[in-house]
């Protein structure tokens, strides 16, 4: 009888542990969970867990879906109140030119619809923090998709989102991977706003947004909502040892002593380091870095917010290897 009770007790403990682990995994949210939302009525805590007590929803404890932080009157809730359709069109003024590969693909509605899957984006902090994040996101992605040149009409920084697919004759971007195996005949070159590339980025991104991008990578270039979601996923997802772009720009990231020794301080420059630091940072003045800053300053001006400090990564050391590698 005692042996029977011991077996039952062990089974109960194992069952309880599985329930707790399952619940914990299911509740991961916010920037720690790739921008996932909590169930209705719950808040996402600053640590990335869902709940409805003060530990999750209280002032200073909540990162998204906070009390009083529900959708506003605009079409995208708080996001729509920070960037209007007319601002979007002004920022990406020449995206629909005949010379642009992405003509009539990138739209305000697609952006707003995609952002609903990442409720912390453009809705965290005060209005200045929200606008600064939007400006930074569009600056970095505009650099990746720019069709501008020095003497372009309205200047080079009015030509973001001109391109959709990587130019030239890109390869298949398919290193061997047992976790993210490439589908026959598929290529994983740069597509969309962030120009996501490689099977090891398409795979986890697709899993996070609920789309099989390993078998259908060209959805990033044919479905505008999915296209924006891939860029937002990259923006919201930490890449250890890198923080997420989101956490940096809203001021949530606290650099370690190693970061400070590497001159990686909070600001737009660290985001460039996250995205393409191995090629652009710590190498002296770089035209690509300056191009990103040029877009950022223009968008901050349109949105009516100051750009903040530490805009370049000229003296920063690269973060090094990460869970996800650079998109380009």
UniProtKB/Swiss-Prot annotation:
EC number: 3.2.1.14
Domain Chitin-binding type-1: 27-68
Gene Ontology terms describing biological process: cell wall macromolecule catabolic process; chitin catabolic process; defense response; polysaccharide catabolic process
InterPro entries given in the database record: Chitin-bd_1 (IPR001002), Chitin-binding_1_CS (IPR018371), Endochitinase-like_sf (IPR036861), Glyco_hydro_19 (IPR016283), Glyco_hydro_19_cat (IPR000726), Lysozyme-like_dom_sf (IPR023346)
Localisation per UniProt entry: Vacuole
Keyword vocabulary terms for this entry: Carbohydrate metabolism, Chitin degradation, Chitin-binding, Disulfide bond, Glycosidase, Hydrolase, Plant defense, Polysaccharide degradation, Signal, Vacuole
Domain of life of the native organism: Eukaryota
Coiled-coil stretches noted in the UniProt entry, renumbered to this chain: none
This protein's record includes keyword Hydrolase: yes
Induction cue: By ethylene.
Catalytic activity: Random endo-hydrolysis of N-acetyl-beta-D-glucosaminide (1->4)-beta-linkages in chitin and chitodextrins
SS bond partners: 29-44, 38-50, 43-57, 62-66, 100-162, 174-182, 281-313
Propeptide stretches in the record: 322-328
The protein's role, per its UniProt record: Defense against chitin-containing fungal pathogens.
Family statement drawn from the similarity comment of this UniProt entry: Belongs to the glycosyl hydrolase 19 family. Chitinase class I subfamily.
PANTHER family (UniProt xref): CHITINASE-RELATED, ENDOCHITINASE
Protein name listed in UniProt: Endochitinase
Lineage of the organism: Eukaryota, Viridiplantae, Streptophyta, Embryophyta, Tracheophyta
């Amino acid at each position: 009888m005692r042996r029977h009770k011991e077996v039952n007790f062990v089974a109960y403990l194992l069952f309880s542990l599985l329930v707790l682990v399952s619940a914990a995994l299911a509740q991961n949210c916010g920037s720690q969970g790739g921008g996932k939302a909590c169930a209705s009525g719950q808040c996402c805590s600053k640590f990335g867990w869902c709940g409805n007590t003060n530990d999750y929803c209280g002032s200073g404890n909540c990162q998204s879906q906070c009390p009083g932080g529900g959708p506003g009157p605009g079409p995208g809730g708080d996001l729509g109140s920070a960037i209007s359709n007319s601002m979007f069109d002004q920022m990406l003024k020449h995206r629909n030119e005949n010379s642009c590969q992405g003509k009539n693909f990138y739209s305000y509605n697609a952006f707003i619809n995609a952002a609903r899957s990442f409720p912390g984006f453009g809705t965290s902090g005060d209005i200045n923090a929200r606008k600064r994040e939007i400006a930074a996101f569009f600056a970095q992605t505009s650099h990746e998709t720019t069709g501008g040149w020095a003497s372009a009409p309205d200047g080079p920084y009015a030509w973001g989102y001109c391109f959709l697919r990587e130019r030239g004759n890109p390869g298949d971007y398919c290193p061997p991977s047992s976790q993210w195996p490439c589908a026959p005949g598929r290529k994983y070159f740069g597509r969309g706003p962030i120009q996501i590339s490689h099977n090891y980025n398409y795979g986890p991104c697709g899993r996070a947004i609920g789309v099989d991008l390993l078998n259908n990578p060209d959805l990033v270039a044919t479905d505008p909502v999915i296209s924006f979601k891939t860029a937002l996923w990259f923006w919201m997802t930490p890449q250890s040892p890198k923080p997420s772009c989101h956490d940096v720009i809203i001021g949530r990231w606290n650099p370690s002593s190693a970061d400070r020794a590497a001159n990686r301080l909070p600001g737009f420059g660290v985001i460039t380091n996250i995205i393409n630091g191995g090629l652009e940072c710590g190498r002296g003045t770089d035209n690509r870095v300056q191009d990103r800053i040029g877009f950022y300053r223009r968008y901050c001006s349109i949105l009516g917010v100051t750009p903040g400090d530490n805009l370049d990564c000229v003296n920063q050391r690269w973060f090094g290897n990460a869970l996800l590698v650079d998109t380009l």
